[in-house]
Structures are given as C-alpha cells and as structure tokens.
Amino acid sequence: MTITPQHLIALLPLLIVGLTVVVVMLSIAWRRNHFLNATLSVIGLNAALVSLWFVGQAGAMDVTPLMRVDGFAMLYTGLVQVASLATCTFAYPWLEGYNDNQEEFYLLVLIASLGGILLANANHLAALFLGIELISLPLFGLIGYAFRQKRSLEASIKYTILSAAASSFLLFGMALVYAQSGNLSFEALGKSLGDGMLHEPLLLAGFGLMIVGLGFKLSLVPFHLWTPDVYQGAPAPVSTFLATASKIAIFGVVMRLFLYAPVGDSEAVRVVLGIIAFASIIFGNLMALSQTNIKRLLGYSSISHLGYLLVALIALQSGEMSMEAVGVYLAGYLFSSLGAFGVVSLMSSPFRGPDADSLYSYRGLFWHRPVLAAVMTVMMLSLAGIPMTLGFIGKFYVLAVGVQASLWWLVAAVVVGSAIGLYYYLRVAVSLYLHAPQQPGRDAPTNWQYSAGGIVVLISALLVLVLGVWPQPLISLVQLAMPLM
C-alpha cells in the first residue's frame, strides 16, 4: 500500500511522540540537562495533543491494516497524552532531588506513551500485542526508577516477571484464536465469529487465555496480586502513569476488540467476565478498607474501578450507550486519579527516599496547605462517586447501562461496592482535617500552586467539579468519538 499525506496526518500523534523520543535521546547523549529534556518531552507531548485537531480534520481512515484512526482512537489517544503530560510534570520536581540519572525518566514515559497511542489506534491483534509490550517494557524501568529504595526495586521485579508471564498467556491465546479462525484483524475476526464459530473449544480457549493476559494488565481479580505492591513501591509520578495511561489505553483496545469481534455474544465469555467484574468490585473495595498507605489504597480502588468499567463492557451488545458510559467514566477516572496521585507526588517532591504515602503524613494537611487539602477532598469524593463530581456522572452511566442490559447482579455489586468505597475515601478526606501532628513528616513546597504539577492538579480539580455539575461538553465529545464501523 502507498502512504499518502492523508495517512501521515492521521498518524501525526504517533510520529510526533516518536520524533520526541529520538530528540530526547540525542539530547541526553549530547549533554545531560534535566530542565532541557523535561521541556522537550512536554513540548512533544503537547504538540501530539494539539495535532489531534488536524487528525480530526483528515477524517476516519485505516492507516495500514494494523491501525485505524477514527474518533474513538482520537479520544483515547487524547486521554493517554494528558496522562503522560501529567506524569512528566509531576516527575520534574520529584526528580530534582534524585541523585542518579534523571533524564531517562522522560524517555521511558515517552516510549510508554507511544505504546498507548498505538493501542488506541490498534485494529489488529498484532498491533494490540505490540502496543501492550511498548507500554509495559518502559514501565519495568519506571517502577524501579528509585532503585536504591528496596520497595521500588522489588515492585519492578514483581511486575516484570508477572508481566512477562501475562504476555505469554496473551500471545498463546492469540495463537489459538488465529489457528481456529485464520484471522488476526479485529473486523475479519468479527466476520468469522459471525458464522456461529463462537462455540469452538479452541476459540474459547484462545479467548480465555487472552482474558488472563489482559486481566493482568488491567489488574482485575484474580490477576490483581501485583497491584498494591507495585503502586506502593513505584515512585508517585510512575503510579500516576500506571493508574491512568496504561489502564485507559488497554481498556480502549479491549473495547474495540469486543465491538468488532462480538466475543460478548458467547454466554460462556459473558459469565466469566461477569464473575471477574463482580469479584473485582467487591474484593477491591473490601481490601481498600484496611489500608493505611494512600498509594496501596488507590491501588485497590483502581481494581474496583476497572470492575465497574467491565460492567459497561459486558453490556456492550445492548447498544451505543455503553460506549458512552466507558468514555465518560474513563475521563472522570483519569482526572480524579491525576489529582489524587498528583497530591501524593507534590507531597513526595523532591525525592528524599520513600514517598509521603502513609495516611498519617496527610493528617491535618488542611491547617497548613488548605488548597491542597481541598483538592484531595474533591478527588476522593469524585472517586467515591458523590454527586456534583465527574465520578458520579460516570458511575451513574455505568448503573444505567447495567439496568438497560438487565445485569441485575452486577448492578447490585456496583451499588454495594460504591457504598463500601464511600467509607475508605471519606477516611482519607476526614484525616486531612484532623489536628496536625506535632512534627509534620513531609510537606508540599510552599508555592506548590505555581509549579507545573500544582497547576495540573488544580486544573484536574476544576474539571472534576465543573464537568460534574455540567457534563454536557464531555458527553458531546464522547458521542462524537464513535469508532468507524
């Protein structure tokens, strides 16, 4: 096939981030300068975000059999870029106090963000696998970036070994699917599945293995065991990326796969996914109840959030509404997580060994950093799904979709899970307003709201509140972002 200028415009975000990777690499080789490399990375990611406008003008198309650029791809590319940008801005003050090599951090974030864009555009199992590897491999390095901290190194090794195992499951599952159907492209798979092939044992085994691999990457129960340890061990800016960008990109591609290849039509697959969703919601919330470490708590809560999203995925066959639900929910989850992890990153910057992640570090934060405490409170309320925040709109959508598809037991799980979640989110929020301990352990810098990370956190809080009261702009955007059928 010939690549036309139209195709190049459609690939702009991918090309810009790829170019930024090369530029940052050369810049590191030329001269180590933390500020320069951070600025280059942020400029590149911003340019990729702006280029989405030109992509939208070019219209939807297939660029190579592996990639399809349409509204859906643009929405998820945008979300991944926002998460990567936030990660870079949170990382800058954190790395200022870090004595080993600082610049490679941005390189790894950029490469992972490249994987995220590839996943958002993937239209083929090969692209899906490449994207997942591109997003996972840099994460091995990022999680262990503070490698002189025992926890960080341990988290990196755990994630690396388990991730390699999960990837092999995923690959073997794809091989079985290919052996049975002879296709790897999502749409061709959809056509061959339409011929009543969904009852073939080989095909079901293939999809089962793929669910194991993808379930690990999305940290769904029972493949979630790495999540709390890795969230706790990884540096705070990395936990931000792990909780947002990698989850959003992978969920986006799974969504597209289920849309084109109606795997959900198989009763067996639906039951398995239903059980996984149910277990993730209940288990994630119950385990978060007893946590005294904020990053572990957010790790367990991310398991339950992915469970809620899975409810919308199972209801995908029942109409357009669940695409909308996932888009709105992910946007709410993105901004709430960016805000929550952003506060942890600001409290932990500059690097001085372990992060400020114990709940005790946040006691009485309100009395000396009132705005930061207010932001953290808003994020906790949004994650809990309290009305007037964006988190509520997303949860409401998921419930509506569940009711529409009459998945009553999952709707019940979402309601019960949200009730349990309320307790531990409010526990974090309340501790911000208690009496401050005599000698506060860690504190955010005095002028935090003027730093790039502080601005990102404040914008996230604003978006969560404004879109929570008036969600129409977001809903319209998500409705525009429909995949090319």
Curated annotation (Swiss-Prot):
Annotated localization: Cell inner membrane
EC number: 7.1.1.-
One record GO biological process: ATP synthesis coupled electron transport
Membrane topology per record: Multi-pass membrane protein
Reactions catalysed according to its record: a quinone + NADH + 5 H(+)(in) = a quinol + NAD(+) + 4 H(+)(out)
Residue ranges crossing the lipid bilayer per the database entry: 8-28, 35-55, 71-91, 105-125, 127-147, 159-179, 203-223, 235-255, 271-291, 297-317, 326-346, 373-393, 408-430, 455-475
Any one Gene Ontology molecular-function term assigned to this protein's record: quinone binding
Keywords assigned: Cell inner membrane, Cell membrane, Membrane, NAD, Quinone, Translocase, Transmembrane, Transmembrane helix, Transport, Ubiquinone
InterPro entries: NADH-Q_OxRdtase_suN/2, ND/Mrp_TM
GO cellular component entries: plasma membrane
Pfam families: Proton_antipo_M (PF00361)
Record NCBIfam families: NDH_I_N, PRK05777.1-1
Subunit details: NDH-1 is composed of 13 different subunits. Subunits NuoA, H, J, K, L, M, N constitute the membrane sector of the complex.
Family: Belongs to the complex I subunit 2 family.
Known function: NDH-1 shuttles electrons from NADH, via FMN and iron-sulfur (Fe-S) centers, to quinones in the respiratory chain. The immediate electron acceptor for the enzyme in this species is believed to be ubiquinone. Couples the redox reaction to proton translocation (for every two electrons transferred, four hydrogen ions are translocated across the cytoplasmic membrane), and thus conserves the redox energy in a proton gradient.
Annotated protein name in UniProt: NADH-quinone oxidoreductase subunit N
Organism: Salmonella gallinarum (strain 287/91 / NCTC 13346)
Gene behind this protein: nuoN
